[in-house]
Regions:
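P-loop (Walker A) phosphate-binding loop of NTP-binding proteins
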Residues: 6
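Glycine-rich phosphate-binding loop used to anchor ATP phosphates in small-molecule kinases
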Residues: 51-112
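Conserved lysine of the Walker
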Residues: 11
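Conserved substrate/cofactor phosphate-moiety recognition/catalytic segment
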Residues: 20-57
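Conserved small/polar residues in nucleotide/adenosyl-binding loops
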Residues: 199-204
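Hydrophobic anchor at the beta1->P-loop junction of P-loop NTPases
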Residues: 3
Length: 209
């Protein structure tokens, strides 16, 4: 299972909760390992390419580690798709940097396993910003509404034509998956009762009524 969406929407929270509920393995991004990320938040134009390339190589290594494990090991819940790397690059990099990024990208093999289900969490930028402020990551406070809007738009375009795996689209604006158990249980009910639904955009809160 892969969970996707823009910064602050609740990907990692949901991945950890699903992993705990079903005794799955959480397969998470490791942004704290990126030595360029702090400077990127403060001054994106100076550190964008280095930040993006580090994430690209990091995700490549994570995918390789995943593929080397036994197919009979436990189910994994990831808080990212490998395709997000190019998505972030298109939002973050200048035209010149994007040319260099593409040259690196085309020489890397990213044969990631196809998820059995992708959950795309959506929320407007005001909600994203409020959640980013609430979780208190000092460096993330530099993220602007303009950046979040461009990122949100990029995600919407990406998933508009996404057909690689079953896709469940969730409006995460009015739900609290971290502390409201009824919201979380409604989402789990939706997933379990519709395991192969494509391009569905219900509200877990509505489902629980």
């Amino acid at each position: 299972i892969a969970i996707e969406g823009p910064i602050g929407v609740g990907k990692t929270t949901l991945a950890n909760k699903i992993a705990e509920t079903f005794n799955y393995d959480a397969f998470l991004e490791q942004p704290a390992e990126n030595p360029f990320l702090k400077n990127f938040y403060k001054n994106p134009s100076q550190s964008a390419l280095a930040t993006q390339l580090f994430f690209l190589f990091q995700r490549m290594q994570q995918i390789e580690d995943l593929k080397q494990r036994s197919l009979f090991e436990n189910v994994r819940v990831a808080d990212f798709l490998i395709e997000k790397d190019r998505l972030f690059a298109e939002v973050t990099l200048s035209n010149e940097e994007m040319v260099l990024y593409e040259k690196v990208y085309e020489h890397i093999t990213l044969d990631a396993p196809t998820p059995d289900l992708v959950i795309y969490l959506q929320a407007p930028i005001e909600i994203l910003k409020a959640r980013i402020v609430k979780r208190g990551n000092i460096n993330e406070q530099y993220l602007t509404l303009d950046y979040l809007e461009r990122l949100n738009d990029a995600y919407s375009r990406f998933f508009l034509d996404y057909k690689s795996a079953p896709l469940l689209i969730i409006n995460a604006a009015d739900i609290n998956l971290e502390s409201n158990e009824s919201d979380y249980e409604a989402l789990i009910t939706m997933i379990m009762s519709n395991p192969c639904l494509l391009y569905t955009s219900p509200s877990p809160r509505d489902l629980g009524k």
